[in-house]
Amino acid sequence: LFASYLSEHPIDVLKIVPSHFKALVATADGQALWPRKFLLFGGEALSWDLVEQVRRQAACIVINHYGPTETTVGALTTVVGDNEDVRLARTVPIGRPIDNLEAYILDERQEPVPVGAAGELYLGGAGVARGYWEQPDRTAERFLPNPHASQPGARLYRTGDLARRLPDGSIEFLGRV
């Protein structure tokens, strides 16, 4: 149904979860699904195989996007390119923080880990929520003071995601902690 709609109404931008997009491509006339300008993936790890499939069949720009609800959904993003350092990642990197957000890869003591080392992904900045509605214990567990910020009262959101910073500064999602 969606694919038939797209064949009659071409679109410029599509934002979708990779597994959903794969299922659509497998069951539909492929050309109808391709947006004319941008294809944004988010919600789960994006494989290089899917990126290559898109590049073979479409001329649109591929963007990978990461962001939990606790950071107003959008937090990190990248235009998927062929940077040699990035291609060393197992999955397509989730990118760099958008304006007014910071991303930290920290160890169990909340200290930064070296480039390439795995650690937990923490997000800070203007997009971080205040906490969970009427759940003070859960809020205290996930929303922490930011020891790396220059402004007093800054907080971090502990995502529970395992990640590493690549040599080019982008971040690769590795799974859940």
Language-model segment annotations:
Residues 1-93, 100-112:
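Adenylate-forming
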Residues 61-64, 79-177:
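AMP-dependent adenylate-forming
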